[in-house]
Structure formats: C-alpha cells, structure tokens
C-alpha cells in the first residue's frame, strides 16, 4: 500500500510561514509510518497537486488583515473540497499572544470560506518581521502603529516587542514546538487512513 500524501501549501510574506511548513514536513517525514510530504508555495499550487493529497495543510501569513495567498486558493476551492482532511495554520507577529484564537479562526473562515475551512482545525503561530524585506507600504503602516504604541501610557510586552523589532531591523518569534498540536492532528488523520 502506498503511503498517504500530505500536501503543505504556504503563503509566506517574510519566510516565517515557509519555515513552519518546512518544520511540519520534517516532523511528518520522521514518523515511523511516514507519509509522502510535498511543499508548495500557494502561488504554484495546481488543482492536480491539491487533488493528489490525502491530507491538505494550508498555511498563511496574517498581515494587515489578510491571509497571504487566500485569494489565489479561493480559485482552487473545488480542488480543495475533494480533500476531506484539511487543516489550516496562520503565522502573525503576535499570534494568539495578542489576537484571540476566535479572531484568527474567523480570519481563516472569511479568507477560505466556510465550505472549505468550516469545522476544520486551525492553528496559529507567532512569526516575526524582517524590516529589510518589508515593502514601503508595510513600513509606512507599521511606522504609524509603532508611533501609536510609543504614545500609549502603558505598553504591554507585545507593544514593546513590536517597537523593538521596528527599531532593531526585525525580530523572529518562531518556535518549532508550536507545531506539535498540528502534527498530532495529522497523526490522527493518518491513523484514519491506515
């Protein structure tokens, strides 16, 4: 019997979402009954690639109110619906440290629509910022945010982290251990397929 196929699609702005995709792939390939794992940027995903999956993992950067690559994947809705076992993850500077889980879950639902993402597991991780790679638009927007945070009479830890990241050229808050619950969910799917 052929090993199940896991396709990991990622929409990465500054590389953090891709890093999580790579870590997920490494952990899955290290399983005793390892599935076949393929990674692809969302922009390169085809219907055929998506339909070849037994398990589909979709990861996206959450930046400026949008999930990177979501509009592209909405065009692949029919292909995604052929894969029963789908799960999602988001990567943002603060993750669930600042955003309530329900807020990020809602971003997934709004971005991919309920028929694709509804009742599917969603995981949320912290990423980072790379000022040297940031577009002028993002830098301008973050300058306003940084200024507002600096003017707050009581800055929380995450306000301070954003200010420091901006002033130090970036920050990386990724943590490989955060993927463990996602990998555990994939293990459940793999057991169902066995």
Regions found by a protein language model. Name each.
Residues 64-194:
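FMN-binding flavodoxin-like domain, especially the glycine-rich phosphate-binding loop
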Residues 1-83, 180-194:
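N-terminal beta1-alpha1-beta2 submodule of the flavodoxin-like/Rossmannoid cofactor-binding fold
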């Amino acid at each position: 019997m052929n090993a199940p196929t896991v396709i990991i699609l990622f929409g990465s702005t500054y590389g953090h979402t891709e890093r999580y995709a790579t870590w997920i792939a490494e952990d899955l390939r290290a399983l005793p009954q390892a599935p076949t794992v393929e990674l692809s940027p969302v922009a390169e995903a085809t219907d055929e690639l998506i339909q070849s999956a037994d398990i589909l993992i979709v990861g996206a950067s959450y930046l400026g109110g949008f999930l990177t690559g979501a509009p592209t994947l909405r065009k692949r809705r029919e292909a995604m619906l052929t894969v029963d076992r789908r799960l999602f993850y988001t990567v943002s500077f603060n993750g669930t440290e600042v955003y309530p889980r329900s807020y990020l879950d809602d971003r997934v639902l709004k971005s991919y629509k309920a028929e694709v993402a509804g009742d599917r597991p969603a995981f949320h991780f912290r990423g980072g910022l790379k000022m040297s790679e940031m577009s002028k638009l993002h830098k301008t927007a973050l300058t306003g945010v940084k200024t507002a945070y600096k003017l707050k009479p009581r800055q929380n830890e995450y306000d301070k982290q954003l200010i420091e990241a901006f002033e130090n050229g970036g920050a990386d808050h990724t943590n490989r251990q955060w993927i463990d619950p996602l990998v555990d969910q994939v293990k459940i799917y793999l057991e169902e397929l066995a």
